A protein has these predicted regions:
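Solvent-exposed loop/turn segments at secondary-structure junctions
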Residues: 81-85, 105-109, 134-139, 172-176, ...
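Charged, glycine-enriched surface loops/patches
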Residues: 147-169, 187, 191-202
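Structural recognition of the beta-strand scaffold that forms the well-ordered cores
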Residues: 74-78, 99-103, 127-132, 165-170, ...
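Catalytic His-Asp segment of secreted/periplasmic serine-dependent ester chemistry enzymes
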Residues: 173-252
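N-terminal secretory targeting modules
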Residues: 1-77, 83-88, 92-93, 123, ...
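Carbohydrate-interacting regions of secretory-pathway proteins
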Residues: 151, 198, 251-429
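Oxyanion-hole/transition-state-stabilizing segment in secreted/luminal serine hydrolases
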Residues: 83-100, 109-151, 156, 167, ...
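Acidic/histidine-rich helix-loop elements
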Residues: 41-54, 87, 95-111, 138, ...
Length: 429
């Protein structure tokens, strides 16, 4: 990033490695020089060759080359200055997770493609987290070119290990004043989603909606220069990634030890999908149950350490429902907790009608909740009396008189993003 030149030079001053002699220094620098010409290089679009960027590229990469063995098996974060600025340990945001930061300030998608093998794949990563594309815009690359480079990167990651999880953060909002207008970023993200539609290996996290203001630009309180996040911005990014990393098995690996209140019975045992299944959409006639199975046959619903996870569909949105095999004709109180990734859309079916369960502040419809905790656990309580239900989230009323039929099952919808449910319990009243 041109505007980041001064900071990059400061990084150079403090990060220069100590070589025993000038010959070693020249060899180290030469190994990671940016090719003088684009001829024969993979991908398309800009490769930056400003002197400050070439120096930073060489210093960062020669330093990483000495850490290959130490960083093997890490979750690797690949990106530009936004990633680099998070620090070597990603700000301590993922306790217990071995991480490796491979962000270089100013880098483009093509630059990341060129260095992918040495900087990322040589580490035999357990997973890769991607954030890329904003610098390409400053260099006047088209959204189509940027998305094509992402496609090549994903192909290389899949070729290396088709089972390795890849998490794609959508390009953060910025500003036209930074040569990164909202419409161009939205177009890139649209194309990114199209690229990964059939990629089961890739989980998309909607970090654009997370950060965008009403005009689609970055917010000053999170991006003071309208490009780089401050501590608050990084905290929001970390919170958006943590649920996905938990689903992938890197965080929250211990079972939930919650004990039900007296009179409540668990509808979900925390270990598998016993008591849950698919039903015919119109009649709600049971068509398949998953007793003893950890996941539904399509992998959308998964039991993980006490959490019933509705995973992010590769195609971006896929509407379906998982239902209890039991039905509930009497008055009851249903309690559960949910956690949503940014802009996630799900729902809780009460005998049949759907109570919207979403990342409310972004996805609605209850955008004015004061106690809702984004990307954290929130409690929903549904009290059914006669033909009506009173529904609350963290004690705030969602629906005071929600009409429900005389009997029916409890259901959980999958739509957009990842939604987790836990501590699902019911008391007949």
């Amino acid at each position: 990033m041109k505007s980041f030149q001064a900071a990059a030079l400061a990084i150079l001053a403090c990060c220069l490695p100590a070589f025993p002699n000038s010959t070693a220094q020249e060899a180290g620098a030469g190994q990671f020089q940016i090719p003088a010409s684009d001829d024969g290089l993979p991908g398309a679009g800009p490769i930056r060759r400003y002197p400050w960027f070439q120096n930073l590229w060489q210093i960062k990469r020669s330093g990483w080359a000495k850490r290959v063995e130490a960083d093997k098996g890490a979750v690797v974060f690949l990106g530009d200055s936004i990633t680099q600025g998070w620090g070597d340990e990603m700000g301590g945001s993922f306790p217990g997770v071995k991480v490796a930061n491979r962000g270089i300030s100013g880098d483009t998608t093509r630059g990341m493609l060129i260095r992918l093998q040495e900087d990322v794949l040589s580490l035999q990563p357990e997973a890769v987290v991607l954030l890329m594309g904003t610098n390409d815009l400053e260099e006047k690359a088209s959204p189509e070119t940027i998305a094509a480079n992402l496609k090549l990167i994903l192909a290389e990651l899949s070729k290396h290990d088709p089972e390795m999880p890849v998490v794609l953060s959508l390009v953060f909002p910025s500003s036209a004043s930074k040569s990164r207008p909202a419409e161009a970023i939205k177009k890139i993200n649209q194309l990114y989603r199209e690229v990964v539609k059939a990629e089961k290996q890739v989980t998309v996290v909607d970090t654009w909606t997370l950060f965008a203001n009403g005009d689609g630009d970055a917010k000053k309180e999170e991006f003071p220069d309208l490009l780089h996040p401050n501590a608050e911005g990084y905290a929001l990014w970390a919170a958006a990634l943590r649920p996905v990393l938990a689903t992938l098995g890197f965080l929250e690996t211990e079972p939930d030890d919650f004990q039900n209140e007296e009179g409540f019975v668990s509808l979900f045992n925390g270990e598998d999908l016993t008591g849950w299944g698919f039903r015919e959409k119109k009649s709600l006639k049971p068509i398949k149950n998953f007793d003893g199975e950890q996941a539904s046959d399509d992998g959308r619903y998964v039991a993980i350490n006490g959490r019933l996870v509705v995973t992010t569909p590769p195609e971006g949105r896929r509407i379906q429902q998982l239902w209890t095999t039991a039905e509930f004709p009497t008055d009851f109180t249903l309690k559960l907790e949910f956690r949503a990734t940014p802009n996630a859309d799900s729902g809780i079916f009460i005998r049949r009608p759907q109570l919207q369960c979403r990342d409310y502040l972004l996805a609605g419809p209850y955008k004015n909740l004061e106690r809702y905790k984004p990307q954290d656990w929130n409690e929903v309580v549904v009290e059914v009396r006669g033909g009506q239900a009173r529904c609350t989230c963290n004690g705030e009323v969602l629906e005071a008189e929600f009409k429900v039929p005389a009997t029916g099952p409890i259901g959980l919808e999958g739509d957009r993003g990842q939604m987790e449910y836990r501590r699902i319990r019911l008391r007949e009243d």
